[in-house]
Amino acid sequence: MSCQQSQQQCQPPPKCTPKCPPKCPTPKCPPKCPPKCPPVSSCCSVSSGGCCGSSSGGSCGSSSGGCCSSGGGGCCLSHHRRRRSHCHRPQSSGCCSQPSGGSSCCGGGSGQHSGGCC
């Protein structure tokens, strides 16, 4: 067997495998955190017409559709649309001046139903 024939029969050495394993693909978007919801006892929903709990003291703001900030246990705000007016009347907010639980707590306790209260 000649030298040239022996070189043709030889195969190239196998490729070396990498020592480090390939990195896992990182997700493009981070996992979304669940929205922070207020506890059920501290805030009320406007659609249900419920009132704030006595422990909360009306801590929910009007921007979030919560309860009145003045007075503990106030009622929810009404569904009325905000009018484009620079003047803010006390009855337009839909808050109750009396504590929750009464049928006449809407409209500043005068018995006028303004909606959204107990």
Curated annotation (Swiss-Prot):
Coiled-coil boundaries: none
Transmembrane segments: none
Biological processes annotated in GO: keratinization
Region of interest (Disordered), residue spans: 1-23, 87-118
Expression by tissue: Skin-specific. Expression was readily detected in adult trunk skin, adult arm skin, fetal skin, penal skin, vulva, esophagus and tongue. Not expressed in the cervix, rectum, lung, colon, or placenta.
Compositionally biased residues, Pro residues: 11-23
Entry's induction text: By UVB.
Low complexity bias locations: 1-10, 90-103
Keywords: Keratinization
The keyword Transmembrane belongs to this UniProt entry's keyword annotation: no
Entry keyword Transcription regulation: no
Ranges of Gly residues composition bias in the record: 104-118
UniProt cross-references to InterPro entries, sorted A to Z: LCE
Pfam families: LCE
Described purpose of this protein according to its UniProt entry: Precursors of the cornified envelope of the stratum corneum.
Subunit structure: Interacts with CYSRT1.
Further details from the record: Belongs to the LCE cluster present on 1q21.
Family: Belongs to the LCE family.
Protein name: Late cornified envelope protein 1C
Underlying gene: LCE1C
